[in-house]
């Protein structure tokens, strides 16, 4: 007999954070991550793209969530036999870096940066952009995520940037790029336009209060026969002008008509003026007004007030009752918006009064009734719809606002004033002129800059665009090849975004980014555009060696215009740089420096098998990947994609440093470990796109530790404690004659298979549930029901089989769940495989497994996923034993409900079921587990219970709203039937998720509960005899003694002396108590431990002593 302890001493109160740190060190010291890649060399690959974060800020819980998901599937595919490279990447260019540098340098704005020096500014950006790279590596490593930092790509690297240039030229050559002056979302704080999808990122829309104004425009129109022919309703009340004063109306330089100062829209009365009312929430755009838009089919009312007639949408009249002095019983002449088309009006201001073709009313299909007056004021320099309509009518846009959002000298009254600060001054002027009618507070969702949180404006800016609208239908087609999680993203969140995709502005008038490779002639007499797609092309044309593609070095490259015979004009690069989202979308080929290098590698690694980010990236990274992949390669960029939700605080607020509503993740790791946070996040619905609320104090993570991690560890602790006490070594064994062994090994296969199916389907929630469910059965059924086998002194085949079975469960699950809880799985696996040498030196582990890796180091992450063919499953046993567990579980629930403690024996349980024959073979087990003296079997269910129909009203109501009243009435009368497994009510067949059949015991029956999915009933006899009460006390005494042993820190094998003054109980149940506690009753000994206990309101003293 050997006294070797083959396994480490494991504490039941493990410090998981410390254990995790030891495992992290083991991985680092033994290069386990790299080995996990090397051992798969030559195997099929699982292609994973790691979306690049910015490193100029610390990681937050959102980053950790994404990282956990990435790590789970990379690890899982590795143990499934795939090679998974995990190259990290960094986003380096763009606004995040520039804003940070401006802040640190104490400068702001284009002019300040230019004066500071572009070279110095970009040098600072280059240094600051990787400011927190070290911290990122610390967080990522501590969360047990394996990534290749050493070979990480950076979007600011010359090779990556050159691939971006190549992509641009490819698009240009395909005719998919154009330059245009268009209205775009514009960040005046950053002095740059934004893409339309950037306004959809990170909840950029937020509530804002603006002053909405209603202003009146004085109509005027030439008096002529042609006018009356076009607008016949004018003829009802025309008044010829007496004083035809042109100074009171504008002149149209094109048609050069002379306008009347009086208007002629009267029907039955003569009016001095006709005024049309327009409503706007952007008062600051009124100085740039050039036209008005109405809805052709909208009804407009002619509303008189004194000698002025106002025109307003009929549906909006009541909102202006006070301003228009209405009583409520007036009748108004109604005209269609189409009858207003072509009318002219007097400009509000003189700034652009001579602008060609302007100050007319047009029909716009975007004009709707609702807010406002049914009339839209048009400022084509500040509205997309405005620009499109006005340009179609020959009206060129004006844009008297500079890059910093301030009025230019074209509006001298407001020059230098920020547009939002100008609203009050404009309102004052409108009042002075008599054009103001109403100001109101308007609360609406308004887009804000995703970097500065300042409200955006819409402003016409020159930009280069990708013609996304030209191939958006193809993107929609390719999207059908992608598996989205959750599934609704494919056709809704992402699919609809693709269907409505607009051309993408990819140029930014900024500094720190990949420069657009476009050179133009500086003389419009000799126009020429050159686009470059490689460093070689640049070096050839400009004759210099290029070492840095950034500004200002690239700006200095000039050459004579080849198309200028005079030789005077010069080719100069346009100042713009790329939208950084273009670079992110270029990641698949940019990281490989394609097509200049690694062409075969890229072709073998595109598209990705898997990517993951949070749901807003359907407008960001996922979208730009899709645009560029479709345009360049006509392929989807990825095949499987998880869109997870967002992490919020316990009250539903966004996590914020300002609000101080979340803890530093490292503090949480040091307290509970990272596996606990991984499980908390990935077992929730946040992986399926929903929100996860997490408390600052980490209670949720602690609960995960207690309810998920601890049960796993408890099973491992139990095994090592007992197997070391017996000096036995566990072995893998998938067969046994013992019914409990066969059952748990069958459940093991089911769990391992479920984990595999779930992770193959990118469903971590179900995978974690399978782990938790298995350990629940392992701990609370298999181990507990097998305790006698582990406790007995004989080291027979049955004991060895029990150890082998438990060992097999632990090792197999350690591998199967290694991606889900990588650190704890590793700790358990190493404990099972790296045993102390027989010499007893615990400092020199010996690997006893045949799957040795270099330097004799093992890791669970170097294993293959468990081979399911090794398992045998007894389905009939599983079904029956699961029913037994169900009976026991419901019995415990009844005891709890009736305050009948578990250790109190009961006389009987009655089981009413059609499957009693299978249950009878487990009768002794049921009696022992439920703590009853007998089991009574019956099959006449109808005498004890009735089946009731419970309908899922919200779900069924959506499908059958018209029949719900009849269905509710029929269900209350039990007028339904089950035919061939289908439930029919009111001639409708219900789906399985639309109802439940509940077994309801008759009202006079106590201690009853349904089980086996409401198909059977059990009844506990809760009446107690004096004998049953005494036996319950004996069982309580056993519990008290076991707790005293634990408190005294006795080993599980220590025999003890017991002294308790309860002769009536010890005389009858003494042998039972001694057997259960390894004790003997004695008096007059010096105790090692004394406990005060309470039984039936009597206080007793319990003394125990360890026997040498």
Swiss-Prot record:
The gene is ileS. A motif ('KMSKS' region) lies at residues 654-658. This is Isoleucine--tRNA ligase. The lineage of its organism: Bacteria, Pseudomonadati, Pseudomonadota, Alphaproteobacteria, Rickettsiales. Its main location: cytoplasm. GO terms for biological process: isoleucyl-tRNA aminoacylation. Its EC number is 6.1.1.5. InterPro entries: aa-tRNA-synth_I_CS (IPR001412), aa-tRNA-synth_Ia (IPR002300), Anticodon_Ile_ABEc (IPR033709), Ile-tRNA-ligase (IPR002301), Ile-tRNA-ligase_type2 (IPR023586), M/V/L/I-tRNA-synth_anticd-bd (IPR013155), Rossmann-like_a/b/a_fold (IPR014729), RPE4 (IPR022439). One of its GO terms (molecular function) is ATP binding. Monomer. It comes from the Bacteria. A motif ('HIGH' region) lies at residues 53-63.
């Amino acid at each position: 007999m050997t006294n070797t302890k083959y396994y480490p001493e494991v504490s039941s109160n493990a410090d998981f954070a410390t254990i995790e740190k030891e495992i992290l060190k083991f991985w680092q010291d033994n290069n386990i991550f790299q080995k996990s890649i090397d051992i798969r060399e030559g195997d099929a690959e699982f292609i994973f793209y790691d979306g690049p974060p910015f490193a100029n800020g610390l990681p937050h819980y959102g980053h950790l969530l994404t990282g956990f998901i990435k790590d789970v599937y990379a690890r899982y595919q590795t143990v499934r036999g795939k090679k998974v490279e995990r190259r990290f990447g960094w986003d380096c260019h763009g606004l995040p870096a520039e804003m940070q540098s401006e802040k640190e340098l104490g400068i702001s704005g284009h002019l300040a940066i230019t004066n500071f020096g572009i070279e110095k500014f970009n040098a600072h950006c280059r240094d600051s952009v990787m400011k927190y790279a070290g911290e990122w590596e610390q967080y990522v490593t501590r969360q047990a995520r394996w990534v290749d930092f050493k070979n990480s790509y950076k979007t600011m690297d010359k090779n990556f940037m050159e691939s971006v240039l190549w992509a641009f030229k490819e698009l240009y050559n395909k005719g998919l790029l154009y330059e245009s002056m268009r209205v775009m979302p514009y960040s005046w704080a950053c002095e740059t336009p934004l893409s339309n999808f950037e306004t959809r990122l990170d909840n950029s829309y937020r509530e804002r209060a603006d002053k909405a104004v209603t202003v009146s425009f004085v109509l005027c129109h030439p008096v002529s026969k042609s006018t009356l022919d076009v607008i016949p309703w004018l003829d009802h009340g025309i008044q010829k002008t007496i004083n035809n004063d042109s100074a009171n109306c504008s002149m149209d330089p094109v048609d050069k008509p002379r306008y009347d100062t009086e208007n002629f829209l009267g029907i039955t009365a003569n009016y001095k003026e006709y005024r049309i009312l327009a409503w706007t929430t952007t008062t600051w755009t009124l100085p740039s007004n050039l036209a008005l838009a109405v809805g052709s089919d909208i009804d407009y009312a002619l509303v008189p007030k004194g000698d002025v007639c106002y025109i307003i949408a009929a549906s909006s009249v009541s909102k202006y009752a006070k301003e228009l002095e209405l009583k409520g019983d007036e009748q108004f002449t109604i005209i269609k918006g189409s009858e207003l088309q072509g009318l002219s009006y007097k400009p509000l201001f003189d700034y652009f009064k001579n602008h060609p073709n302007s100050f007319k009313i047009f029909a716009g299909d975007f004009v709707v009734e609702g807010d406002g007056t049914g009339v839209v004021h048009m400022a084509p320099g500040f509205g997309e719809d405005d620009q499109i309509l006005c340009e179609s009518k020959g009206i060129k846009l004006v844009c008297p606002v500079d890059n910093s959002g301030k009025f230019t000298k074209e509006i001298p009254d407001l020059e230098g004033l920020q547009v939002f600060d100008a609203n009050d001054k404009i309102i004052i002027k409108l009042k002075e002129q008599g054009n103001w009618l109403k100001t109101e507070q308007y609360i609406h969702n308004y887009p804000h800059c995703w970097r500065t949180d300042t409200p955006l404006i819409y402003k016409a800016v020159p930009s280069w665009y990708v013609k996304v609208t030209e191939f958006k239908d193809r993107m929609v087609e390719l999207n059908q090849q992608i598996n989205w999680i959750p599934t609704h993203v494919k056709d809704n969140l992402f699919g609809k975004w693709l269907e409505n995709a607009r051309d993408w502005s990819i140029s930014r008038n900024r500094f720190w980014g990949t420069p657009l490779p476009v050179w133009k002639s500086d003389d419009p007499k000799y126009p020429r555009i050159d686009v470059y797609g490689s460093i070689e092309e640049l070096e050839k044309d400009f004759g210099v060696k290029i070492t840095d593609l950034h500004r200002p070095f690239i700006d200095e490259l000039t050459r004579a215009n080849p198309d200028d015979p005079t030789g005077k004009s010069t080719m100069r690069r346009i100042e713009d740089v790329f939208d950084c989202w273009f670079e992110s979308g270029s990641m698949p080929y940019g990281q490989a420096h394609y097509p200049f290098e690694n062409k075969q590698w890229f072709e073998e690694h595109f598209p990705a098998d898997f990517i993951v980010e949070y749901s807003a990236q359907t407008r960001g990274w996922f979208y730009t990947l899709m645009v560029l992949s479709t345009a360049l390669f006509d392929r989807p960029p990825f095949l499987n994609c998880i869109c997870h939700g967002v992490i919020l605080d316990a009250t539903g607020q966004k996590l914020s440093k300002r609000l101080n509503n979340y803890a530093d993740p490292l503090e949480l790791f040091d307290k509970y470990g990272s596996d606990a946070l991984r499980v908390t996040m990935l077992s929730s619905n946040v992986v399926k796109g929903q929100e996860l609320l997490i408390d600052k104090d980490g209670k949720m993570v602690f609960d995960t530790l207690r309810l998920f991690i601890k049960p796993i560890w408890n099973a491992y602790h139990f095994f090592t404690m007992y197997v070391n006490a017996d000096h036995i070594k566990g072995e893998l064994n998938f067969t046994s004659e013992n019914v409990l062994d066969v059952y748990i090994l069958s459940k093991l296969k089911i769990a391992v298979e479920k984990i595999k199916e779930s992770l193959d389907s990118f469903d971590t929630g179900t995978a974690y549930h399978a782990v938790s469910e298995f350990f629940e059965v392992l701990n609370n059924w298999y181990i507990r029901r097998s305790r006698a086998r582990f406790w007995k002194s004989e080291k027979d085949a049955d004991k060895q089989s029990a150890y082998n079975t438990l060992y097999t469960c632990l090792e197999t699950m350690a591998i199967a769940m290694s991606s889900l809880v990588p650190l704890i799985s590793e700790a358990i696996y190493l404990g099972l495989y790296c045993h102390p040498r027989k010499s007893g030196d615990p400092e020199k582990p010996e690997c006893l497994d045949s799957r040795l890796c270099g330097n004799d180091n093992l890791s669970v992450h170097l294993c293959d996923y468990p081979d399911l063919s090794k398992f045998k499953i007894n389905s009939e046993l599983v079904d029956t034993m699961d029913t037994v567990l169900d009976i026991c579980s419901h019995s415990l629930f009844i005891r709890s409900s009736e305050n009948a403690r578990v250790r109190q024996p009961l006389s009987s349980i009655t089981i009413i079921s059609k499957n009693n024959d299978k249950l009878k073979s487990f009768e002794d087990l049921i009696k022992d587990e439920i703590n009853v003296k007998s089991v009574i079997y019956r099959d006449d269910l109808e005498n004890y219970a009735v089946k009731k129909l419970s309908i899922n009203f919200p779900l069924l109501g959506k499908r059958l709203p018209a029949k719900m009243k009849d269905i509710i009435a029929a269900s209350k009368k039990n007028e339904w039937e089950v035919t061939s497994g289908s439930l029919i009510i009111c001639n409708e067949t219900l789906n399985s998720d639309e109802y439940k059949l509940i077994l309801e015991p008759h009202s006079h029956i106590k201690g009853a509960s349904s089980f086996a999915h409401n198909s059977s009933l059990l009844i506990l006899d809760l009446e107690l005899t004096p004998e049953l009460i005494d036996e319950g006390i004996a069982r309580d005494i056993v519990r008290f003694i076991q707790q005293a042993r634990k408190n005294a820190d006795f080993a599980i094998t220590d025999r003890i002396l017991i002294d308790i003054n309860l002769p009536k109980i010890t005389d009858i149940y003494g042998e039972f108590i001694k057997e259960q506690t390894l004790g003997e009753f004695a008096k007059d000994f010096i105790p090692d431990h004394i406990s005060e206990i309470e039984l039936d309101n009597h206080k007793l003293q319990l003394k125990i002593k360890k026997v040498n």
